[in-house]
Amino acid sequence: MSASQLPHPPRPSQTKIVATLGPASSEPGQIAELIVAGVDVFRLNMAHGNRDEHGVRLAAIRQASDELGQPVAVLTDLAGPKIRLGELPGGELTCDSGAAIRFVRTSPLPPHAPVEGRDGGEPKAERPTELTTTYEPLIDELAVGDRVMLADGTVALTVEEVGKDYARCTVVQPGLIRSRQGVNLPGVKLSAPALGAADLDNAVWAAQSGVDFVGLSFVRTPEEIRRLKSLLRSHGSEAQVIAKIEKPEALDRLGEIVEATDGVMVARGDLGVEIDIARVAVVQKEIIAACNRCRKPVIIATQMLDSMQHSRIPTRAEVTDVANAILDGADACMLSGETAIGEYPRQAVEMMHRIALATEPLCRRRPPLPEPDLDAAGVNQITEATVYAAGRIAEKLDARLVVVASASGATALSLAKNRNYVPTVGVSDSPSTLRRMCLYWGVIPLSGAPTGDSEVLLDYITTWGRNAGLLESGDRIVLIAGTGLAVTAHNMVVVHELA
């Protein structure tokens, strides 16, 4: 497609938006609507639905992206060793303070057993005050005094006795629980690996389906990340790994995990149950800072606009939460139930976009992000210096656009992490690289641009920019040619002034 045929000007939001697909947002028209509203990355949550359903969604995403001429990335989120309650008699149970509740041993489920959102397959309790779970070794790994948190921490139990096939608990924080809700064991080190049999199968499916990012849930060690990367590469996938920080063990090895991964998600739901909820905001800031030092994209997730599942307008606290995540240096904010099962998915995306637009001007007045740890980030020193200089040149010359040409996307990511506030366009001859740029702060991926010759590329960008109303005579463009693009275009900066 020629530059003159590209009708869609870049969105001004520099913060990227990740949206989870589900029953409320899976029709092709709905997906296209969400892209237009501002979605950069779609999340397929493997804890809900099945691969056939996700395959249909993936095809619809790719089709909408092609029709709109706009790259969009896909993140497949592996369920990981999430423990869930089995089926409860009647579907729910009121847990009164001081009541006795027993967990009873269940048989292990096969690797392809249905998970939440599918019919059947969950272990069933026989008595009202007995609970089963999807985690067969639970009884063996509990000890007297352990805390058990149910339903995102709204109900709390204390283990009083552990027998051969049961664990007797007392309710210390009452509330209502339902079938298939989550179970958290703060402080208990579980034997379950981050990649179980079902996760390995789903990772292979993700690799073969050509997704762009794979989320690894409940990460505890960098070795788990390297194992997933190796599996993806063995199936010919270029997908990058997003480590989800949800466990105290991950915080203990945060530096190693950030260094090993390609990106990070601050998964505040389980994290806020596994650690003291009062610490979540501080820990979020620490994780963002670690990612920025290592030049890794970081996504903030869970309950960002949660009330918009049922309301057209978010709470003031939610708006402030999104804004503060942006001010802290997050690259992306994520919507979960808001777009997957909510009543107003498009409005939720539009609201997040509006909050980003209102907040980003203040980012310019904030202290710069920390100096990178180049060894940990794996960033070439020449690339980092070139990108830094190009950003300063663009600001000094009041350039209208920065164009970064990058074969792998590394130069574009480095530019994003330098927080250059001049609108930035990323180009590459690799469609997968362009899609990965969808997660990079402030980088607008532009498909179809000729990358082999700098002069031809500048002509293309000039035509495109004029048609989009972004450029006029006398404006300046700064071009950065990234490492590996072409022999004559390694780490160079070109300033072009429109005639």
Located regions from the model:
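Non-catalytic helical/linker scaffolds that mediate oligomerization, partner binding
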Residues: 1-499
